[in-house]
């Protein structure tokens, strides 16, 4: 205790001393700091500077030192800087390896498609929320023909609607009871029954609430005044029901007030008959003669019989008032087979004939017709035609493709031309003109005049014309010899033919056959061709004179002129069509429905009962399948002419998918009961159905696992385009991302490229306003605009809609009409989302959208595509287009149009990116697929050179293993020579033994670590992304984690090329950066992925196989094998050599079993053009023989491609899959419906139309056609559209082909006077 007391004072003293020492040190430091600060303030630092001469000397010496050391650097004398650089690189590489730094590549974010793409609207037809009465809505929804009335007319009809209550079993009408009415079921269920010959009743259709029962043919009978009771059809209530009944007599009052509406309604009924009834029964069920009544429907020719027999044969009389003066040449040449055809055969096989007179004769006729003459139309008659979109007659003329000029310009009317007389020479292959005068008139010609006048009187009786002068100048008498083909099935320009003497045989081509069957005979007093004239649709049969025949002919234009003055003439003509239909067609007319589906509405849902089959008439449908986990997947899309739901209906299975409308669509509905009745009545229909199902199964077998139309059948003759969403595209809308996008130039370039595939129409808001009036986009004219746009789809291969830069009514219309929307942006701009895109995203737009990025020719390569796509979950794909300089030229619209006027006169470049886009949009893409095979793949580089030299375009590239490497180079490089250099450099690097030795590792997973191989691949492609490639590309790998094939279309290019080349045992599997799955060489599962390219939309796949061929001639060693015996056979030089696989070879063959089977399927498919260079002598690692192997591939490619060119394979590749390539670009430009006879174009050639009634294909093409007017007349003989570019009354008649029945005559040169017949 005492020691502790002594220590405490000492510790206290030490602490006090330490504190004093610290305080003293702090005071000293503070004092020194203050003195130092005062010293600095007292003496400021002097500011030194260089004198100017010293500065010049300093920089001069520095520059001289650089110059002095530069030569030493160039000759590598100074090793120190290079050594430092190498050391720095090695240190950085070592640090990366130690620290495992990984470069982050931009990745495409996986996004679910927008709900509007895969989901149908949940709300069905809403009656409660409408301001109209339910009965009115039901009637308007069901009866297609009523939609063609204006609102006041329709409401007036609805005044006649009555309610009828039915008990179970009660009949609406029974056989032999007249029931001229339209019935709509408000609640309950009706059954439509057909009575068989044995008296049994068959239910062909069940009518549920909201559906209707009516026969448009029966309604037409009421309208024409020929009502007749139904002999075999009855309708009864299956349960207590309430129906709405609209008597057909209510139509009479409306038609008396609005006679033009009569024309329109009759035309729609005729269109339904041809499009719905004949399409379903003939094209799909193969019925021909069963559809027509072969009994004579002739009227007695009282006037003709009263004229004395005898007439001058083979003369054509257009009138008796005026005659042609004698021309300088009595005979002119006639194109024997304009547009191409096949030689005629005996029997019903007919020669092709086009109704076009010789150019020289046409010129003389036009000169005569320019003189004023009799027959001028009545100035008080109403106007019609495309420029007059406000009248029903104008709408009817639009559908029939007839242009009736304003009566203010009588000189331009077809009817205002003086009528002439032309004689067809005796020799069928020549056409001569007969000069006549009133003084030299022969007895024969006077008799023909008498017969002509008498025949016109009989025709007046049949057509029920009140004014005989309506036929003056509009009817021609033709005398044709035996064997003459008057008109051909599929011809657009039809005429009404009234037989006076002889017979006209009517033939129709059998489905799936080259044979024609005779439908019926047209006897004296009967008409033929009136259905095609009324509807404007192509002819559904061929008309041929098997014996000498005389008949009156009224062209389509003349008939519509008559109809404009007396609309009721349509009733008599339509009645002759109905009388020609068989009783079977009348029965089926009750069962068939014409259905309109709004965008987003489901026609059926997955799991529903399959009670009918649908046929696409217009629009677009999408099929979506719901998986067990609730996820939805796109199963396919359907376009015009496709069969929908036929498989489930025939197999009586529930609906496998949900099908909804992408846009407003029209469908024909064939109930299952009606199909059963048809099969019972005509058993041959079963054979046709088996054929359809067999095609479906065969297509599925050839395709393998596909993603497209799982349950759809395409149209007759088309291929199974199962995975291509661009199949059957009819309309494409283009819209800009920003105002800087040259959208007008882009649309014109695309139209130019599409014109090489088929007739193309470009529509803009200005164009629509010019053609249809400034009020065409108003809601009042909604239906008329939709109808007119639908007609443009009928007549063109594809219609382009150019949207405005903002969300205008026209932009909304473009989106509504589009099967596919192209969003156009500039690739060199910052990735952004346009305001127009944001506005559209808020609406349910179901059309698939594609992103199109434009690039300049001299600009940088595509980059940052991933950023563009990540901003747009609604885009299903993208394309990069390298545009010519003219696209980005800053020209005013007139100058731009003037420039493209010259562009359209040249054929498009098939290798341009715009042509690639055109082929993709029309389903005509050509894919290049490269197989795996190690060093043998160097031959693919040579084949690519031959491919370019032979002019074969490539729209898609895919590959496996070495094929993935070569394909990636081809897709990235636009220059072949540069691609070859890069491929050769890489191949030379693969021969380095030192690099291979340094990459060796302990062989647990593989012999090599893969680092050296990775660096060689990365040195070729750098940081390139698959999305940035010029040509769409995919690579194939084998996912050993999921035991599945992987198709890579996005991500790091070098990564997936390396994965596709990872041979088992040599390289370790590569981990997919997306999901961590292990990826191996794609050759194990699909070494030649032609089927993948096909499923991605290719029409033709060029497949280059370089794989090794296995030895198949192996030794049969029995049921046991001794390794010692094999060792003895191998070591003993005197023993017979045996071929037995070792363990490694057996494992390799097992790995490639799936690949070999897939290769055989691809080689046997009809879409694949298989190519294999002779490279079996080279091994997998012979990369040192790059030049030699490449040359082998080049020589083989040139040989094969030359054979393709001579045999027509190349032509078949470039031909449109929906039919032969229509015209050259110039022909399409002159007349976009080049395969049709456009009467508007005919008249405009004689007299240019008023600006308000322009009938061009776009506002840009107006200027184009002005220049083409100066082309010599003889040049038009080379176009198939000749008949659409000249106008005269003789358009259909004077150009009839007069040929020997069994000979096809070559073309005659101008001035030739004779030809052997």
UniProtKB/Swiss-Prot annotation:
SMART domains found in the cross-reference section: cNMP
Transcription regulation found in the keyword field: no
Residue interval(s) of motif GXGXXG: 932-937
UniProt-annotated binding residues for a nucleoside 3',5'-cyclic phosphate 3: 591-696
Enzyme Commission numbers on file: 3.1.1.-, 3.1.1.5
Region (Involved in the binding to lipid droplets): 659-945
Free-text note regarding domains: The 3 cNMP binding domains are required for localization to the endoplasmic reticulum. The cNMP binding domain 3 is involved in the binding to lipid droplets.
Family under the similarity heading: Belongs to the NTE family.
Descriptive protein name: Patatin-like phospholipase domain-containing protein 7
């Amino acid at each position: 205790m005492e020691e502790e007391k002594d220590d405490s004072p000492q510790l206290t003293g030490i602490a006090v001393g330490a504190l004093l020492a610290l305080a003293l040190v702090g005071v000293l430091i503070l004092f020194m700091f203050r003195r130092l600060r005062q010293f600095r303030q007292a003496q400021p630092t002097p500011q030194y500077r260089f004198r100017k001469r010293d500065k010049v000397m300093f920089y001069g010496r520095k520059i001289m030192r650089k110059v002095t050391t530069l030569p030493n650097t160039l000759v590598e004398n100074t090793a120190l800087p290079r050594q430092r650089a190498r050391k720095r690189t090695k240190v950085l590489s070592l640090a990366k390896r130690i620290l495992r730094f990984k470069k982050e590549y931009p990745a495409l974010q996986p996004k679910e498609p927008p709900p509007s793409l895969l989901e149908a609207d949940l709300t069905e037809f809403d009656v409660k929320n409408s301001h109209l009465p339910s009965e009115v809505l039901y009637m308007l929804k069901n009866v297609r023909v009523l939609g063609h009335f204006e609102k006041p007319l329709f409401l007036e009809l609805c005044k006649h609607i009555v309610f009828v209550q039915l008990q179970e079993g009660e009949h609406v009408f029974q056989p032999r009871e007249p029931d001229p009415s339209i019935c709509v079921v408000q609640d309950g269920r009706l059954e439509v029954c057909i009575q068989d010959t044995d008296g049994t009743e068959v239910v062909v259709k069940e009518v549920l609430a909201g559906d209707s029962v009516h026969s448009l043919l029966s309604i037409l009978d009421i309208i024409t005044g020929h009502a007749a009771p139904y002999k075999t059809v009855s309708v009864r209530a299956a349960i207590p029901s309430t129906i709405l009944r609209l008597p057909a007599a209510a139509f009479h009052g409306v038609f008396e007030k609005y006679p033009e509406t009569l024309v329109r309604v009759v035309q729609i009924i005729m269109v339904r008959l041809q499009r719905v009834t004949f399409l379903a029964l003939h094209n799909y069920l193969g019925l021909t003669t069963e559809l027509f009544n072969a009994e004579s429907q002739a009227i007695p020719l009282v006037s003709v019989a009263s004229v004395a027999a005898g007439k001058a044969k083979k003369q054509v009389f257009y009138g008796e008032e005026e005659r042609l003066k004698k021309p300088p040449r009595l005979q002119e040449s006639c194109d024997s087979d304009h547009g191409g055809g096949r030689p005629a055969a005996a029997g019903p096989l007919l020669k092709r004939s086009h109704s076009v007179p010789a150019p020289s004769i046409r010129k003389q006729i036009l000169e005569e017709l320019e003189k004023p003459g009799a027959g001028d139309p009545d100035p008080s008659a109403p106007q019609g035609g495309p420029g007059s979109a406000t009248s029903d007659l104008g709408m009817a003329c639009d559908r029939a493709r007839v242009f009736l000029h304003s009566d203010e310009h009588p000189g331009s009317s077809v009817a205002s031309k003086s009528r002439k007389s032309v004689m067809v020479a005796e020799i069928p292959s020549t056409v001569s003109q007969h000069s006549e005068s009133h003084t030299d008139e022969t007895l024969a010609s006077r008799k023909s005049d008498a017969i002509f006048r008498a025949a016109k009187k009989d025709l007046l009786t049949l057509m029920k014309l009140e004014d005989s002068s309506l036929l003056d100048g509009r009817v021609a008498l033709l005398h044709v010899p035996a064997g003459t083909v008057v008109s051909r099935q599929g011809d657009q320009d039809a005429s009404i033919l009234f037989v006076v003497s002889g017979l006209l045989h009517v033939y129709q081509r059998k489905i799936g056959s080259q044979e024609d069957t005779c439908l019926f005979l047209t006897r004296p007093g009967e008409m033929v061709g009136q259905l095609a004239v009324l509807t404007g649709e192509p002819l559904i049969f061929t008309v041929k004179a098997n014996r000498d025949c005389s008949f009156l002919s009224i062209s389509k234009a003349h008939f519509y002129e008559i109809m404009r003055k007396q609309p009721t003439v349509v009733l008599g003509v339509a009645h002759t069509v109905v009388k020609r239909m068989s009783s079977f067609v009348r029965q089926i007319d009750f069962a068939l429905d014409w259905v309109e589906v709004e965008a987003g509405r489901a026609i059926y849902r997955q799991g529903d009962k399959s009670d009918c089959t649908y046929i696409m008439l217009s629009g677009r449908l999408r099929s979506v399948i719901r998986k067990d986990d609730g996820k939805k997947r796109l199963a396919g899309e359907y376009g015009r002419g496709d069969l929908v739901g036929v498989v489930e209906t025939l197999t009586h299975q529930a609906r496998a998918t949900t099908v909804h409308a992408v846009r407003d669509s029209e469908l024909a509905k064939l109930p299952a009961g009606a199909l059963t009745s048809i099969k019972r009545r005509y058993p041959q229909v079963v054979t046709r159905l088996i054929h359809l199902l067999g095609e479906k199964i065969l297509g599925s077998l050839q395709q393998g696992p596909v993603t497209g139309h799982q349950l759809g059948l395409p149209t007759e003759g088309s291929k199974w385009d199962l995975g291509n969403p661009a199949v059957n595209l009819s309309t494409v809308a283009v819209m800009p991302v920003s105002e800087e996008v040259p959208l007008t130039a882009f649309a014109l370039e695309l139209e130019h490229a599409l014109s090489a595939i088929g007739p193309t129409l470009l529509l803009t808001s200005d164009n629509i306003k010019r053609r249809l009036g400034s009020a065409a986009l108003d809601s009042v004219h909604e239906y008329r605009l939709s109808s007119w746009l639908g007609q443009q789809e009928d007549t063109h291969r594809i219609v382009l809609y150019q949207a405005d830069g903002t969300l205008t009514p026209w932009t909304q219309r473009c989106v509504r009409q589009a099967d596919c929307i192209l969003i156009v942006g500039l690739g060199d701009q910052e990735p952004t989302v346009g305001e127009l895109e944001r506005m559209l995203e808020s609406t349910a737009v179901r059309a698939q959208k594609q992103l199109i990025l434009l690039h300049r020719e001299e600009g940088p390569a595509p980059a940052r595509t991933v950023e563009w796509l990540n901003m747009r979950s609604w885009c299903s794909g993208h394309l990069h287009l390298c545009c010519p300089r003219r696209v980005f030229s800053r020209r005013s619209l007139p100058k731009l149009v003037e420039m493209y006027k010259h562009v359209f006169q040249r054929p498009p470049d098939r290798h341009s990116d715009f042509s690639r886009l055109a082929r993709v949009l029309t389903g005509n893409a050509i894919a290049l697929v490269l197989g795996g095979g190690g060093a043998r793949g160097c031959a693919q580089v040579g084949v690519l050179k031959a491919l370019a030299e032979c002019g074969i375009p490539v729209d898609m590239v895919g590959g496996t293993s070495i094929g993935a490497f070569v394909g990636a180079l081809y897709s990235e490089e636009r220059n072949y020579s540069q691609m070859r250099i890069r491929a050769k450099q890489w191949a030379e690097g693969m021969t380095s033994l030192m690099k291979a030795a340094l990459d060796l590792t302990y062989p647990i997973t593989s012999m090599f670590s893969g680092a050296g191989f990775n660096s060689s691949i990365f040195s070729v492609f750098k940081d390139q992304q698959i999305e940035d490639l010029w040509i769409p590309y995919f690579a194939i790998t084998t996912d050993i984690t999921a035991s599945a094939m992987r198709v890579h279309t996005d991500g790091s290019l070098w990564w997936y090329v390396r994965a596709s080349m990872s041979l088992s045992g040599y390289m370790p599997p590569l981990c997919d950066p997306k999901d961590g799955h292990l990826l191996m060489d794609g050759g194990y599962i699909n070494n030649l992925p032609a089927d993948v390219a096909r499923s991605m939309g290719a029409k033709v796949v060029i497949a280059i196989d370089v794989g090794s061929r296995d030895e198949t001639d192996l030794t049969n060693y029995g049921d046991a094998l001794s390794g010692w015996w094999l060792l003895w056979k191998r070591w003993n030089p005197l023993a017979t050599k045996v071929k037995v696989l070792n363990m490694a070879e057996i494992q390799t063959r097992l790995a490639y079993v799936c690949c070999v089977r897939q290769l055989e399927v691809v080689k046997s498919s009809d879409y694949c053009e298989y190519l294999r260079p002779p490279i079996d002598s080279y091994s997998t690692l012979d990369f040192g023989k790059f030049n030699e192997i490449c040359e082998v591939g080049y020589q083989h490619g040139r040989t094969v491609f030359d054979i393709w060119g001579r045999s027509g394979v190349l032509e078949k590749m470039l031909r449109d899959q929906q039919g032969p390539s229509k015209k050259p670009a110039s022909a399409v430009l002159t007349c976009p419906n080049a395969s049709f006879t456009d009467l508007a174009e005919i008249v405009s050639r004689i007299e240019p139309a008023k600006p308000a009634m322009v009938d061009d294909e776009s506002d840009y093409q107006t200027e184009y056609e002005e220049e083409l007017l100066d082309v010599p007349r003889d040049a038009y003989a080379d176009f198939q559209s000749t008949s659409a570019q000249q106008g005269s009354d003789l358009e259909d008649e004077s150009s009839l082909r007069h040929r020997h029945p069994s000979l096809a005559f070559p073309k005659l040169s101008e001035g030739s006077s004779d030809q052997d017949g």
